[in-house]
Amino acid sequence: MSAPAISYSEDSALSVLLDQEFAPERLAELCPESALDARHWQAALYEPLRGFLARPGKEFRASLVRLGYRIAGGTEELPLALPELVEILHAGSLIIDDIEDDSSSRRGAAALHRQIGLPKALNAGNWLYFWPSRLLQQLSLPATAELSFHRAMNQMLLNCHYGQALDLGATLGEVGRAELEPAVRTLSTLKTGSLMGFAAESGALFAGASPSVVRTLNRFGQELGVGLQMLDDLGGIQSERRAQKGHEDLLNGRLTWVWAWLAEAVDATEFDLLSQMQTQVQARDLHPEVLCAKIRPVLKKHRVRVHLHLDKAFGELTSAVGLAPGVGELRRTLSVLEKSYD
């Protein structure tokens, strides 16, 4: 059973924002001295992104923005663009991620670079990193608040790229058994947790929360991100439906929670055997499913580890802010989301 997904319809917030950005009068501002045909931008940028953003998604990060806002005391309706900023940034990271991994699919369709070619997909993914800055400007925030947003967003983007560099630059054979857990935790916090932390803190920033509340929500979001990465890594091994993801991780020798947990769960002899099989998988001398079958029994109860991690994150949040509105609803949403990793 998969978690319910949100399909970005013609009237979705992302569609509305994208249509506004590519309105004829807006495109005319880019080239005021000539009647350059808007079809060039539409074909290379608008149409591919309209299709990509229309693919089903869960909008969990947007929910985190709303939660942060409510915890910080916000009562008015949020501007249309604010919760979508993180979804836009996330969409950009997915496009770039798929290019770097040469993934074949994303959200039920071909990866964007497989659809429109690498150059256009690369430009589209990068454009999604910068569009939120323009949307922030359009919110007409007080100068100090806008500066805080930009600083938080820039730090998040920097951390995400540090995490991606570690994901691309370090493989299993290069990290010792004792260093696996801290390396995987660092990677997960930077690459996945940073965006979730920004989502949680951005709502609080908009509500004018104190620095301590902003820091608490950022930390909470980071830990949620780490928990979701745990689910993602484990699901790639345990779920038949998500086997392609698990196989891809093994073929690329990625640092995942699977290997961090294996380093704790088995003795040195067994770990060496699994590592040798991993080397064969990376060399394409062994099918990754053979290694998956060897790993599954060892990690069959490790979903409990994920639950303990998430329970701790929610417990720390409650200790800091009390039984704030929206926390229970987010927990229920997360329970449904968890099923998408099965």
Predicted features, each with a name:
Residues 1-35:
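N-terminal amphipathic/basic leader segments beginning at the initiator methionine
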Residues 249-252, 307-310, 327-332:
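Amphipathic alpha-helical protein-interaction segments enriched in hydrophobic
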Residues 273-318:
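Mobile late-domain/C-terminal helix-loop "cap" segments
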Residues 17, 48, 294, 298, ...:
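Charge-rich, solvent-exposed alpha-helical interaction surfaces
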Residues 14, 21, 25, 30, ...:
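Amphipathic alpha-helices that form helix-helix packing interfaces
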Residues 39-271:
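Mg2+-dependent prenyl diphosphate-binding active-site environment of isoprenoid biosynthetic enzymes
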Residues 321-342:
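Short, amphipathic C-terminal "tail helix"
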